[in-house]
Amino acid sequence: MNPVNYLYLAALLFTIGATGVLIRRNAIVVFMCIELMLNACNLAFVAFSRMHGNLDGQIIAFFTMVVAAAEVVVGLAIIVSLFRSRHSASVDDASLMKL
């Protein structure tokens, strides 16, 4: 498969994720769409790395996945805290949380 096709796929995935972030109000769905956008960026990094014949993009994608794993833990903890306090996972309720 041509590496340009992977870039088209990455652009499509990023667009789907951005649309989900802008349209949906459920925090879990918004969080999943953000992860989809992050994975689209990883796919673009790997495709550019493959096109240019070096490993820099693959290394960046690996470190991005490591950071995304930590982001998942923190993000889900915030969503669980929001759900326990408000009995809703709506993004609109997140502004009501206090420290």
Curated annotation (Swiss-Prot):
GO molecular function, a single term: NADH:ubiquinone reductase (non-electrogenic) activity
Membrane-spanning residues: 3-23, 28-48, 59-79
GO biological process, one term: ATP synthesis coupled electron transport
EC number, as in UniProt: 7.1.1.-
Bilayer topology annotation: Multi-pass membrane protein
Sorted UniProt keywords: Cell membrane, Membrane, NAD, Quinone, Translocase, Transmembrane, Transmembrane helix, Transport
Catalytic activity: a quinone + NADH + 5 H(+)(in) = a quinol + NAD(+) + 4 H(+)(out)
Family annotation (Pfam families): Oxidored_q2 (PF00420)
GO CC field: NADH dehydrogenase complex; plasma membrane
HAMAP family cross-referenced by the UniProt entry: NDH1_NuoK (MF_01456)
Family that this chain belongs to: Belongs to the complex I subunit 4L family.
Subunit: NDH-1 is composed of 14 different subunits. Subunits NuoA, H, J, K, L, M, N constitute the membrane sector of the complex.
Function: NDH-1 shuttles electrons from NADH, via FMN and iron-sulfur (Fe-S) centers, to quinones in the respiratory chain. The immediate electron acceptor for the enzyme in this species is believed to be a menaquinone. Couples the redox reaction to proton translocation (for every two electrons transferred, four hydrogen ions are translocated across the cytoplasmic membrane), and thus conserves the redox energy in a proton gradient.
Stated name of the protein: NADH-quinone oxidoreductase subunit K 2
Organism of derivation: Streptomyces coelicolor (strain ATCC BAA-471 / A3(2) / M145)
